[in-house]
């Protein structure tokens, strides 16, 4: 039994082709169970189609075969793309022993890949007579069939068929065959012989030992789709189908997808490959086209090649057919809308139309090429009363006289009796046959009354057979060279029941003396090729070269006429071509080199306005006239030339005057040019002398706007330091008061003082910071108030009462709402957008460098690393220094390149800090590992309260390509949209049930502990008055009162209560609490009180408003009123006197216990309290979100260590609040160049973070 199995595999190996290159492909049919169009030629049709065929591109339909039919032409078929149908046949067996695979791309009755139906003698009563020989199919003999990819099996009403029920069809079906149905009828007239004992488990296709079924699926080891045996090493390659002889994809019996030169592949090699080195698409020399299940170097004839590498019969949308010079056809994409084409039957809007009728024949008027087919049925000329279609008239068929090509087939089974031929198609040259009638015929003529064909221009039948039968009066069928029309060996002419050739010759219906006796009908116009010469469409014995009119010349056996102006010659040629300059002699005149009917007289040649005058001499040659008149040429002489006219004296005078004027103008122009030349030489000499003596520098204007910001120089006596807020490597920050000389004003300020013995570089850096801060003018960027040039330089800035934003969100984690977070994001983005507009790169944006002026107003600060770009700069390259690694963009770490887009990266990290309530980015990861981590694609995780909308904005900010990051103006728009509907984008648990946003903080309460901090004037109120900013000046009497002023002050009484005094002056009415303020409150305390608190305010103490009358020049321009993402109020409130002036109603004083909860800001979207669920966030390595309360202050964090080469600072007891003025997020690995400040500072803790590296050390 094993020996027999190996013998079967040896037979299969012998049948395996060496590659797809020598595979013979043929077309299938599509007749299903219909009777053949010509039963007498049906077997011949099958023989022509399948003789030597190995792959059937279509269906293999074997129907209506007689019992004695010889079917040996089927024995080479190995693969069928569609289905196999064996029906109504009387043969005993069908030799398909080599058929391995049925792909089922088309299915019989939409379900079956193999159908065997009604193969037996039709017997009355279904019982054969005793001893009678019964015909019909006995055995399938599909011994090599081991794969059906799609479709089931239908075997019915074949009473002589045996062994169909012994086949293990499960082994034949592919594992992914969803239509694996088997409907098998086993009713037989007689018993069948059993399978051979050599067949394992009695699975066979016939009774002999060679008909045993080869199992290639059910016997396989686990995981094998197909195999050659039961061992795990017998598995076939995954691209194999029908079995294999080895494990490689070149050992397959058939390919599951595509056969590439004997190797099974999932895809054919692409025609174009991409070169990653040159970033170009290159032609692939190994590229192949897809043709069925094969990969071919070029598409077969009559198929169209596409740019995507496929062979198709119809071009895709927006493509057009193009025929190359070598005759190959391809689909080419239209550069503009494709030209209109004519569609035939079976295409587009005529897809369901059966025949050409009077209703659709006008679709083909003027068409030279029809994409589709043409069919003429009896209904075409009989009409259809049901659809009100009139009969087609013979004269209407003349629309096809211009037709030259049909891409489908031509089928004619009815034709008008008044037309003895098909001469309406006399210019038809090609029938391509891309679509065939019944899947077999490209030309079918049957049952017609014509006498000859008349297709005199037909030169090609691209595919399919020609069927001409049952035309009782048709002659000249055998005089056509059909073999010259066919393009592949499977094409042939099938003819029967036409008029006998002897009768045609007897009636004189013979060819004109044509070349080789080939013609389409009688007469000289029906020759396929002429034996002598061709004049137009007519064959002639000779051309009219020497006699006859019109005279002709010969070119490539064509008789072509001479020009009409050529003079006919006697006994010699008249011309050498068809043009007027190719005549031997002219019939009338010669205007060299052309023969003309008359000489040109006043004729204007092409593209000329000058007429030409010529006359004919004695020899008939045209000569130019002595006078060439251009206008007023009415007087002509006897030769037809213009007569000579005497010049008028007026003309001479005019010419002289014009000449003199022209000479004067030329002289003036020359004089001016000479003078200017001398001036230029003198100017050049003077400039050279000045440059040589270095008296004047050359001008190189940049076009940049001048920076008109003012630097305010303050005296040390005007400043009073109150307490230390923080200390850094280069100086200390104090809380202080600025008391301008000569004024009764106290302004709370922050004073940054350099340490003693600081390096010159440190002095330069703090002056650079002063230069940057003095030039900004935005409500969201901290401004410089002045500079004090003492022995240690001091910078004076606004005092932000709420400290830095990082400590603020950490301290009030449970009291912040979604609207607060999104409003801060909007304000920071607006500040950074302003810095981008003024070409300032911050380089150090982080939550620690954003100060809180009020709970609703934050400002960007710390410009120690900021750099102002010049007018022609787009980026800044740093040369060293401390940098915040975990906040920096990837291109800013090793290349030291900083742009506005690198600030966008830092902005994304800052937003992440806010959304995690102050968590540390990349917590627990050393700073040196950050670049590698970012290059590998790791980013900070999504904060728990963020929706995907907010997080995706962060992710866009962290794109490697800086050009892919959003601009700040885009970030302003995005977060402004989110701030209008905050709870949709930031989800904080129990936000609606929590307390309102806090007013003060630990840092703010520490500022109020000093008595000197009461009764202060905000710096912006002192410097920037804003009259008429909100509304026009009210007219006298409007509202019944004049303007009054008011401002806010805050103190603490002895009982620790916070008392707010808000008092109006007598000149100004109370203002609406809904009126927006650009500063959103005072610098000392926000005047935007809650309505509940506002109702309790009573009488307010008065204060001298004289400080508010001081005006100073300021280079900034107030921006339009903005609501930072909130909805602005629709009403227009009275205008405040100054920008950050709080607006309240006059109320009695109100004493509050503890911190005062504020109301929702003016114009807020939702009136609701805010809180955050106090749940503990889970830790992690990259960007771990820990409990922000576990962080403590920024200074006490034990993770931040002293850098190399510097002594660690002595620990200090943690203060009650986190000053965070000494930034601990930076590290300079080589601090020697920057000086060595003392390791400790009296009363102020300092720290440096080792996670942040210096730029002067390679990362």
Curated annotation (Swiss-Prot):
Provide the membrane topology annotation. Answer: Single-pass type I membrane protein
- GO biological process terms on file: cellular response to epidermal growth factor stimulus; cellular response to growth factor stimulus; epidermal growth factor receptor signaling pathway; intracellular signal transduction; negative regulation of apoptotic process; neuron differentiation; positive regulation of cell growth; positive regulation of epithelial cell proliferation
EC number(s) per entry: 2.7.10.1
The reactions it catalyses are: L-tyrosyl-[protein] + ATP = O-phospho-L-tyrosyl-[protein] + ADP + H(+)
**Localization per record:** Cell membrane; Cell projection, Ruffle membrane; Early endosome; Cytoplasm, Perinuclear region
In chain numbering, motif Nuclear localization signal lies across 675-688
**Where does it primarily localize?**
membrane
Q: According to the entry, what is the taxonomic lineage of the organism?
A: Eukaryota, Metazoa, Chordata, Craniata, Vertebrata
Biased-composition ranges, Pro residues, are 1145-1160
Q: Which residues bind ATP?
A: 725-733, 752
Record topological domains on the Extracellular side: 23-653
Chain positions covered by the region annotation Interaction with PIK3C2B: 1199-1201
Residue positions, PTM Phosphotyrosine: 876, 1111, 1138, 1200, 1252
Task: Please give the name of this protein.
Answer: Receptor tyrosine-protein kinase erbB-2
Provide the gene name from the record: ERBB2
User: Per UniProt, what is one GO molecular function of this protein?
Assistant: ATP binding
Organism, as annotated: Canis lupus familiaris (Dog)
Top-level EC class: transferase
Taken from the UniProt record, the cysteine pairs bridged by disulfide bonds within this chain are 26-53, 162-192, 195-204, 199-212, 220-227, 224-235, 236-244, 240-252, 255-264, 268-295, 299-311, 315-331, 334-338, 342-367, 475-504, 511-519, 514-527, 530-539, 543-559, 562-575, 566-583, 586-595, 599-622, 625-633, 629-641
Q: Tell me its family.
A: Belongs to the protein kinase superfamily. Tyr protein kinase family. EGF receptor subfamily.
